[in-house]
Regions:
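Oxidoreductase and adenylate-handling cofactor-binding alpha/beta cores
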Residues: 139-152, 163-178, 205-219
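A short hydrophobic/small-residue beta-strand
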Residues: 101-102
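Substrate-binding/catalytic subdomain of NAD(P)-dependent oxidoreductase enzymes
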Residues: 179-234
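NAD(P)-dependent dehydrogenases' Rossmann-like dinucleotide-binding region
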Residues: 152-163, 225, 229
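N-terminal glycine-/serine-/threonine-rich beta1-alpha1-beta2 phosphate-ribose binding loop
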Residues: 1-97
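Rossmann-fold NAD(P)-binding glycine/threonine-rich loop
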Residues: 86-96, 106-144
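Short glycine-rich anion-binding loops that position phosphate/pyrophosphate groups of nucleotides
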Residues: 82-84, 132, 160
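Short acidic, glycine/serine/threonine-rich loops at helix termini
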Residues: 20-21, 54-56, 113-116, 138-145, ...
Length: 234
């Protein structure tokens, strides 16, 4: 009998809760897709006592990182933290403990990609990040799997949904930038602090990751020329 895949999660916010809910509510479907059962073994959060929309048994959730890092039964860890630290440190520890990683943290990979992928290569581990860049396409698997025999000469695309929404509304309706930004925030297209979206940071970090996939080179994301939306009036 094939043994199940046991996964750990670091963080259980909106994305983490969704991951746990899918795995818990659709075990047969997931098992067919993966070829064997996929089980949530342990989830690490800051406050295990916090009320959540999807509750886990008390022995499956804690604030003890070692419960995931040092568990030999866990082979894959979903690192669901934003920002650079402690995400970078935890990622390195997990890779060195023999875990494969899944993350959507584009800022982490764009900033520390060479180091993290270097550790992964050294340990014979992998880092999956489909959700970090245009996951709806999905572009990461398209480049790394479907187009491996193709020579890519350039990459063009819309990589930031917030900017796309704002520019489209400004062009079609002739609306003012600040007016459309407020609309985007009220409708959930923009964060309360939209800085990284409207100044080009989000798009350049994604482009840095795509550049690595397509051309095998790490380009510092901050060195990529970018022009934000703040100075556009109409």
């Amino acid at each position: 009998m094939t043994s199940p895949i046991r996964i750990g999660l670091i963080g259980m916010g909106t994305v983490g809760t969704g991951v746990v809910r899918v795995l818990k509510n659709s075990p047969e479907h997931i098992s067919r897709q993966a070829g064997r059962a996929v089980l949530v073994d342990h989830v690490v959060v800051q406050d295990p006592s916090k009320k959540r929309s999807f509750e886990l048994p008390s022995d499956q959730i804690s604030n003890d990182f070692a419960q995931v890092r040092d568990n030999p039964d866990i082979s894959i860890v979903a690192l669901l933290l934003g920002g650079l630290e402690p995400a970078r440190t935890l990622a390195i520890e997990l890779l060195k403990s023999g875990k494969d990683l899944v993350t959507a943290n584009k800022a982490l990979l764009a900033e520390h990609g060479p180091e993290l992928f270097g550790v992964a290569h050294e340990m014979g581990r992998s880092i999956a990040f489909e959700a970090a860049v245009a996951g709806g396409i999905p572009i990461v698997s398209a480049i790394s799997e479907c187009l491996t025999g193709n020579r890519i000469s350039s990459i063009r695309g819309i990589l930031n949904g917030t900017s796309n929404f704002i520019l489209t509304k400004m062009e079609q309706d002739g609306s003012d930038y600040h007016e459309v930004l407020s609309l985007a925030q009220s409708e959930g297209y923009a964060e309360a602090d939209p800085t990284m979206d409207v100044d080009g940071t989000d798009a350049t970090q994604k482009l840095a990751l795509l550049t690595h996939l397509a051309f095998g080179q790490w380009v510092p994301w901050a060195s990529i020329p970018r022009f934000g939306l703040e100075s556009i009036d109409q």
